[in-house]
């Protein structure tokens, strides 16, 4: 059998003392903020259900179809309608959009082509 020396005992005690001195690693989310969107809650427990509804994920309470389920109520309507002047639109209606009918024969200049490192590579 191998005989333990003082050096071996010192190594063993230092290893155990280091393990005892180390604090436990903190949880990943120490400050959860919103517990629904943090990692403090187990995703399997995020379901909610009442006697009138089926179980549903808390993170996704509404679907796209639920946003348009109710028609707008009168208290959401604006009180006054103030149309803006349509001068720009009227000008476009009479003159049309700008058309550039010139012929583009010049080389395209980009930063890559104009860079001194790439000037003689083409």
Curated annotation (Swiss-Prot):
Q: Name one GO cellular component term.
A: sperm flagellum
Q: Where does this protein have compositionally biased stretches of type Basic and acidic residues?
A: 1-23
Q: Name one GO biological process term.
A: determination of left/right symmetry
Q: Does the keyword Cytoplasm apply?
A: yes
Give the start-end ranges of region Disordered. 1-26, 99-122
Give its localization: Cytoplasm, Cytoskeleton, Cilium axoneme; Cytoplasm, Cytoskeleton, Flagellum axoneme
Keywords from UniProt, A to Z, are: Cell projection, Cilium, Cytoplasm, Cytoskeleton, Flagellum
Note whether Endoplasmic reticulum occurs among the keywords: no
- What gene name does this entry carry? Pierce2
Instruction: Quote the protein name from its UniProt record.
Output: Piercer of microtubule wall 2 protein
Function of the protein: Microtubule inner protein involved in the attachment of outer dynein arms (ODAs) to dynein-decorated doublet microtubules (DMTs) in cilia axoneme, which is required for motile cilia beating.
State the similarity comment.
Belongs to the PIERCE2 family.
Description of how the protein assembles with itself and partners: Microtubule inner protein component of sperm flagellar doublet microtubules. Interacts with CFAP53, ODAD1 and ODAD3; the interactions link the outer dynein arms docking complex (ODA-DC) to the internal microtubule inner proteins (MIP) in cilium axoneme.
- Residue ranges of coiled coil: none
